[in-house]
């Protein structure tokens, strides 16, 4: 989207935007429940160096040596591989951590703010992981997959359980089922109550919307996977990106649409493990 349109959108969102403590980026699961062990074997906790290796975002294993996440999770102040670790096979945060080092951090070159799209990044692990029942890559969709409206999909993460209410100990992985919302409907919903002209799109072509009032991702879930079962196979439809608050009426969660970036992903990630 052109800088001018982005500026117009940001100006119109001032009154509706979250307070400083409620960034547009997503961080937690609302309206969901604790995920059964090993149900989502591709789920990743992305950690950043702090007083300890703190959970920053979610992510997904898409190859034994590659993790997919959101670009806003790794920048702009964090760019070096040594700034990050990855945790797989984790049901509860910080319990029996076995953190894996990263060798490459690759944000999409067109990313500069979540509202403008391209909110996607790749992390290469120093070594491939061993695949097991508990650790498996998620399947990426074919370019032709559209994920039609009302498809029931799942989003997972360790984010907030309500607006401004962090996930309490023992920090279990949460899951929630969310319906896909057609992009034009999602865009109309986001314009509702704003002064932004309807000719200025809020939802981008490379976005995918999902969720309704009471069921959504939230702060801390950013970068995590939105998965949909198609013909018996779990496909990653989106990467948790942004939204206005969490689980608000007329404010579905906004995801990066994986099919928009398959060519870019496969510049780096082998299509066969």
UniProtKB/Swiss-Prot annotation:
One of its GO terms (molecular function) is serine-type endopeptidase activity. The keyword Lipoprotein does not apply. GO terms for biological process: proteolysis. Residues 29-270 form the Peptidase S1 domain. The lineage of its organism: Eukaryota, Metazoa, Chordata, Craniata, Vertebrata. Belongs to the peptidase S1 family. Tryptase subfamily. This is Tryptase-2. It holds the Pfam family Trypsin.
């Amino acid at each position: 989207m052109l800088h001018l349109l982005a500026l117009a959108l940001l100006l119109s969102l001032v009154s509706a935007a979250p307070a400083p403590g409620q960034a547009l980026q997503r961080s937690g699961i609302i309206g969901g429940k604790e995920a059964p062990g090993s149900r989502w074997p591709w789920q990743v906790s992305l950690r950043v160096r702090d007083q300890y290796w703190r959970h920053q975002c979610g992510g997904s294993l898409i190859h034994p040596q590659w993790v997919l996440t959101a670009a806003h999770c790794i920048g702009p102040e964090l760019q070096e591989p040594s700034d990050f670790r990855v945790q797989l096979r984790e049901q509860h945060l910080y319990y029996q951590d076995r953190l894996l080092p990263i060798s490459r951090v690759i944000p999409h070159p067109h990313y500069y703010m979540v509202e403008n799209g391209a909110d996607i990044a790749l992390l290469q692990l120093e070594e491939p992981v061993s695949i097991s029942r508990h650790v498996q890559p998620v399947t990426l969709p074919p370019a032709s997959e559209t994920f039609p409206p009302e498809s029931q999909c799942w989003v997972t993460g360790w984010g907030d359980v309500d607006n401004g209410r962090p996930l309490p100990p023992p920090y279990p992985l949460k899951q929630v089922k969310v319906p896909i919302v057609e992009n034009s409907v999602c865009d109309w919903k986001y314009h509702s109550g704003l002064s932004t002209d309807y000719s200025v799109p809020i939802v981008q072509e490379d976005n995918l919307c999902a969720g309704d009032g009471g069921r959504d991702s939230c702060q801390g879930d950013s970068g995590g996977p939105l998965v949909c079962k198609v013909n018996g196979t779990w496909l990653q439809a989106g990467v948790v990106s942004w939204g206005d608050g969490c689980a608000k009426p007329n404010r579905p969660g906004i995801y990066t649409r994986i099919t928009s970036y398959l060519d870019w992903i496969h510049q780096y990630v082998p299509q066969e493990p």
